[in-house]
Curated annotation (Swiss-Prot):
GO terms for biological process: flavonoid biosynthetic process; pollen wall assembly; polyketide biosynthetic process. Expressed in anthers. Expressed in young and adult flowers. The gene is PKS21. This is Type III polyketide synthase 21. Gene3D superfamilies: 3.40.47.10. It comes from Oryza sativa subsp. japonica (Rice).
Length: 389
């Protein structure tokens, strides 16, 4: 890992250089989770009861999906009490967008505030020192947006500069890191609070043969929030950075805009995921990663550490095979998927939390690493990062 100082960023593989002057760093993390814990072994019964479904074929398919996701635990806003209050949510063909948004807007604010307070507590400085807020969600829709309500709830100064990134799906967290990095490096002395908050309430509905992906969502996706604080020029006596954000890039794959497809309707959001998503990612991932690694002259994929948004096990498996990665390279991504499910924009931050733990324990020998996420577009988000002692 790099020492906390200033120097030339281009050190190559295997060396331990000082940190680059003016580069953004990850200073703190936090998360917020719903009270309802959903063990994977209870998903089938819970979902079928919640949706009043007794179809044997649906049960069999959901059981198969739950076994293949590798998820063990998720957290969810949805509850029996919520469904008792809003029985229309489990009635097929009912216009429910308004109550769904009412539930989602309140839930993401509460979860986001919890995550932000956790990050602020770890950071150790007052909320008034936050100069910018980057807010990410694919679960709310309102004016003014959740960024304003979150800033108010946290007691941020009225002149805090706010940026919202909405409906970016699974690439939203990495996009927020890229945005925060650019803000921090172009506004000396700034401290950027990043908050991502998601819930699956917007897409919850009874199973239907016309929407086979609904069962994938029931088996894979979870709810939660995460937060991070980004800044350049850390104060040695007050801040403890663990990751330097060196270089970021984004790329979309032309002609793939229907592979990850979501539409807001009167019944919520209808979401579809193409079976060829892992293949599409595999076809481009090597060149995309080399664009990042070439910045520091690294040629071998096993010579960096990896923090990949775990959209599902199929994508991680394809990456591991395609790039000939050692099994431990994607261990923290698989761990995040196992313990939280796919929480859309949040999940990459849960991966980074595990990365921080391994960096602190000296379990990672590589100096450089990659953060990756894939979202609608198909959009690739990538960042070259460096661990800090």
């Amino acid at each position: 890992m790099a020492d906390l100082g200033f120097g030339d960023a281009r050190s190559g593989n295997g060396s331990r250089s000082q940190c680059s002057r003016g580069k953004a760093m990850l200073l703190a993390l936090g998360k917020g989770l719903p009270e309802q814990v959903l063990p994977q072994e209870k998903v089938v019964e819970t979902y079928l009861q919640d949706t009043i479904c007794d179809d044997p074929a649906t049960r069999a398919k959901l059981e198969r999906l739950c076994k293949t996701t590798t998820v063990r635990t998720r957290y969810t806003v949805m509850s029996k009490e919520l469904l008792d209050e809003h029985p229309e949510l489990r009635t097929e063909g009912t216009p429910t967008l308004t109550p769904r948004l009412d539930i989602c807007n309140a839930a993401v604010l509460e979860l986001g505030a919890t995550a932000a307070r956790a990050a602020l507590g770890e950071w150790g400085r007052p909320a008034a020192d936050i100069t910018h807020l980057v807010y990410i969600s694919s679960s709310e829709l309102r004016l003014p947006g959740g960024d304003l309500f979150l800033a108010t709830r946290l007691g941020l100064h009225p002149n805090t500069v706010r940026t919202s990134l909405l409906f970016l799906g699974c690439s939203g967290g990495a996009a927020a890191l890229r945005t925060a990095k650019d803000i921090a490096e172009n506004n000396p002395g700034s401290r950027v609070l990043v908050v991502a908050a998601e819930t699956t309430v917007l897409g919850f509905r009874p199973p239907s043969p016309d929407r086979p992906y609904d069962l994938v969502g029931a088996a894979l996706f979870g709810d939660g929030a995460s937060a991070a604080i980004i800044g350049a020029g850390p104060i040695a006596a007050e801040e403890s950075p663990f990751l330097e954000l060196q270089f970021s890039t984004q790329e979309f794959l032309p002609g793939t805009d229907k592979v990850i497809d979501g539409k807001i309707t009167e019944e919520g959001i209808n979401f579809k995921l193409g079976r060829d998503l892992p293949e599409k990612i595999e076809n481009r991932i090597e060149g995309f990663c080399r664009t990042l690694m070439d910045r520091v002259g690294i040629k071998e994929f096993n010579d960096v550490f990896w923090a990949v948004h775990p959209g599902g096990p199929a994508i991680l498996n394809r990456l591991e095979v395609c790039l000939e990665l050692q099994p431990e390279k994607l261990k923290i991504s698989r761990k995040a998927l196992m313990n939280y499910g796919n929480v859309s924009s949040n999940t990459v931050f849960y991966v980074l939390e595990y990365l921080r733990d391994e960096l602190k324990k000296g379990m990672i020998r590589e100096e450089w690493g990659l953060i990756l996420a894939f979202g609608p577009g198909i959009t690739f988000e990538g960042m070259l990062v460096r661990g800090i002692n």
